[in-house]
């Protein structure tokens, strides 16, 4: 049985990474695909754990070689998912989660129409502003650009299957887990997973 591909996207500052990490800790059946990026590591980020950090030249070389499942220019830096991180795992029956932006999500849905997509929204613009400023990693000009980009990104929430409002962290994580559980209980998935049982019941 082929694995399920999950897509999680959100504007910067909505708490996407924290929710994803907490969800994966509760649901070990899903593997997180580590993205490639051309940007420099932020304080505390480690290569191959948070991102695969490569130069812009290396990233372009991977594009030309057709190595990416999806890629996009995000906030002036390249981000992408390697084919090798996704296709073999799905074919082997493993579930894979992509933590990407809406541009990458659009590309993925074109290639995998049955992918399950989730968009995370902040509870308010004020909360988004406060969360982004708490990072303390960007100048005021960069912060203004990120806030403007976040508002643009939120316009694309309608392209996703599910929407989570990250007002209370634990609730948001529980809702994400519920989405994964519901996905596994879809009729098509259950028919494949329990084909023998269903056949025996109906004979």
UniProtKB/Swiss-Prot annotation:
Assigned EC number: 2.7.4.8
Entry keyword set: ATP-binding, Cytoplasm, Kinase, Nucleotide-binding, Transferase
Molecular function in Gene Ontology: ATP binding; guanylate kinase activity
Annotated ranges, domain Guanylate kinase-like: 3-181
Database matches in InterPro entries: GK/Ca_channel_bsu (IPR008145), Guanylate_kin-like_dom (IPR008144), Guanylate_kinase (IPR017665), Guanylate_kinase_CS (IPR020590), P-loop_NTPase (IPR027417)
Kinase keyword on record: yes
Main location group: cytoplasm
Catalytic class of the enzyme: transferase
Subcellular location per the Swiss-Prot or TrEMBL entry: Cytoplasm
Cellular component, GO annotation: cytosol
Superkingdom of the organism of origin: Bacteria
Catalysed conversion reaction: GMP + ATP = GDP + ADP
Transmembrane segments: none
Annotated ATP binding sites: 10-17
Homology family: Belongs to the guanylate kinase family.
HAMAP family xrefs: Guanylate_kinase
Function description: Essential for recycling GMP and indirectly, cGMP.
Name the UniProt record assigns to this protein: Guanylate kinase
Source organism of this protein record: Xanthomonas campestris pv. campestris (strain ATCC 33913 / DSM 3586 / NCPPB 528 / LMG 568 / P 25)
Organism phylogeny: Bacteria, Pseudomonadati, Pseudomonadota, Gammaproteobacteria, Lysobacterales
């Amino acid at each position: 049985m082929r694995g399920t591909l999950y897509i999680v996207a959100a504007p910067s500052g909505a708490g996407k990474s924290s929710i994803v990490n907490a969800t994966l800790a509760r649901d070990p059946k899903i593997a997180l695909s580590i993205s490639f990026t051309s940007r420099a590591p932020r304080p505390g980020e480690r290569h191959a754990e948070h991102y695969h950090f490569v130069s812009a030249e290396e990233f372009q070389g991977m594009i030309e070689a057709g190595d990416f499942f999806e890629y996009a220019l995000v906030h002036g830096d390249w981000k992408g998912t390697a084919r090798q991180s996704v296709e073999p795992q799905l074919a082997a029956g493993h579930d894979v989660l992509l933590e990407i932006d809406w541009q990458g999500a659009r590309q993925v849905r074109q290639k995998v129409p049955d992918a399950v997509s989730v968009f995370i929204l902040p509870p308010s613009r004020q909360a988004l502003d406060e969360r982004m400023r708490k990072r303390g990693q960007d100048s005021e000009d960069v912060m203004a650009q990120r806030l403007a980009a976040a508002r643009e990104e939120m316009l694309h929430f309608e392209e996703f299957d599910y929407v989570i409002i990250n007002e209370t962290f634990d609730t948001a994580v529980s809702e994400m887990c519920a989405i994964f559980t519901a996905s596994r209980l879809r009729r098509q998935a259950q028919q494949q997973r329990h084909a023998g049982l269903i056949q025996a019941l109906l004979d």
